[in-house]
UniProtKB/Swiss-Prot annotation:
Protein's name according to its UniProt entry: ORC1-type DNA replication protein
Keywords: ATP-binding, DNA replication, DNA-binding, Nucleotide-binding
Gene3D superfamilies tied to this protein: 1.10.8.60, P-loop containing nucleotide triphosphate hydrolases, Winged helix-like DNA-binding domain superfamily/Winged helix DNA-binding domain
Residues reported to bind ATP: T72, G73, K74, T75, V76, Y220, R232
Organism, as annotated: Pyrococcus abyssi (strain GE5 / Orsay)
BP GO annotations: DNA replication
PANTHER family: CELL DIVISION CONTROL PROTEIN 6-RELATED (PTHR10763), ORC1-TYPE DNA REPLICATION PROTEIN (PTHR10763:SF22)
Keyword DNA-binding: yes
Gene that this sequence comes from: cdc6
């Protein structure tokens, strides 16, 4: 459009909208969406239903421990079954409450109890603040509100390992024994985890009461992931938009990473977004490969964002060396730039030995490559290179107040001194 021409935004939006012929309903591919059917999880659905069905006869069901690797459908399946149970129970006039708690966010004894009490706040008018009360008092309140009437309360503790690692198993001890202290209501707990090691942190009594029943979620194989994606794709994309190889490729890439359905769905969604943005009429395998790259890069950015400050300064030293044309560098060369940066920031530098450990950590995270090479009679040394572009790293650091002051410094030619 020439300078003098008027920009008609309404027309522009309409034109852009018309060009969007890829997604019929993208929401279907989001993590929060619960599909109407869960292919390849019928066995687990039935196992959970068998354990929970006593509720419909007024009997207390066992506590359940659900485990399996990430993206194997644990959360979606438990939510699906408990919500169905809630619906069916209405027919039998048996009140069922399902309380879902994500322990990655709600990760202390106190907050778990407070969340349970507050779940009933519309009914009871009681709301516990998220800090401040003595824990015993919150627990007493919890018993009081739950026991106000005859009902079944199913407490789902997702990512239960995070809770136990952060705050111990005291809250599980109380909740799995609470029925002996209630007169009207009955409670059962469903714990979900993708980390089996956390069981070692549990008191054996807690372990045996939590694991009265166990339901295992095995990883999906590529064919199963294909079915899951095909079902979602029917609702998410316009007909004929996906090239034949797209779903099998997404499924194969995700199967390689321990059969993670979340990863498979992400690949399909991002491939569609890339195709849409470039105005393509079809999603092709090329888009899937680019989606894979983008997801990996985004993950890398997240990892860099959450590094401790010392590792960020170290990484920035490597960025400066790269921009100065000085990579590969050895540990000593990186260390001397790192020390100067610490001085610039007024930060106490770590020893070279410790920095060598942090270099290994960055290598393990895939951010840098630190290859050990032999220098003949001079012994062995590391050759350090960057695996992420300096541009990407600078972009992440731009929003980081602690490291921001460094972004304007650069190295002085061969001397590797700060400018
Ligand atoms: N059998 C299935 N059919 C359809 N969608 C599925 C199926 N299994 C998993 N999904 C989808 O994959 C994504 C991940 O599933 P979910 O969150 O239940 O995994 P998870 O096992 O709880 O993982 P994590 O341990 O990481 O929390 C969700 O978007 C979910 O809807």
């Amino acid at each position: 459009m020439s300078e003098g021409e008027q920009l008609h935004l309404d027309k522009l939006f309409e034109r852009l909208l018309k060009a969007r012929k890829i997604f019929k309903n993208k929401e279907v591919l989001r993590h929060s969406y619960t599909p109407k059917d869960l292919p390849h999880r019928h066995e687990q659905i039935e196992a959970l239903a068998q354990i929970l069905v006593p509720v419909l006869k007024g009997e207390t069901p066992s506590n359940i421990f659900v485990y399996g690797k990430t993206g194997t459908g644990k959360t979606v399946t438990v939510k699906f079954v408990t919500e169905e149970l809630k619906k069916v129970s209405q027919k039998y006039n048996i009140p069922v409450e399902v309380i879902y708690i994500n322990c990655e966010i709600v990760d202390t004894h106190y907050r778990v109890l407070a969340n349970i009490v507050n779940h009933f706040k519309d009914e009871t008018g009681i709301e516990v603040p998220l800090v401040g009360w003595p824990t015993d008092e919150v627990y007493a309140k919890l018993k009081q509100v739950i026991d106000m009437k005859e009902r079944f309360v199913i407490i789902v503790l997702d990512e239960i390992d995070k809770l136990v690692k952060k705050s111990g198993d005291e809250v599980l001890y109380s909740l799995t024994r609470i029925n002996t202290e209630l007169k009207r209501a009955k409670v059962s707990v469903i714990g979900i985890s993708n980390d089996l090691k956390f069981k070692e942190y549990l008191d054996p009594r807690v372990l045996s009461s939590l694991s009265e029943e166990e339901v295992v979620f095995p990883p999906y194989d590529a064919n199963q992931l294909k079915d899951i994606l095909t079902q979602r794709a029917e609702e998410a994309f316009y007909p004929g938009v996906l090239e034949e190889g797209v779903i099998p490729l997404c499924a194969a890439l995700a199967a390689r990473e321990h059969g993670d359905a979340r990863k498979a769905l992400d690949l399909l969604r991002v491939a569609g977004e890339i195709a849409e943005r470039e105005g393509a009429s079809k999603v092709t395998e090329k888009h899937v490969w680019r989606a894979q790259e983008k997801i990996e890069q985004d993950m890398m950015e997240e990892v860099i964002k959450t590094l401790p400050l010392q590792s960020k300064v170290l990484l920035y030293a490597i960025v400066l060396l790269d921009e100065n044309g000085d990579l590969p560098a050895n540990t000593g060369e990186v260390y001397s730039v790192y020390r100067e940066l610490c001085e610039y920031l007024d930060l106490e530098p770590l020893t070279q030995r410790r920095i060598s450990d942090l270099i290994n950590e960055l290598d393990m995270l895939g951010i840098i490559n630190a290859k050990v090479v032999s220098k003949g009679r001079y012994g062995r040394t590391k050759e350090i290179r960057l695996n992420v572009t300096p541009y990407k790293i600078r972009n992440v650091f731009r929003y980081d107040y602690a490291i921001q002051p460094l972004l304007t410094v650069s190295l002085k030619g061969g001397q590797r001194r700060l400018l």
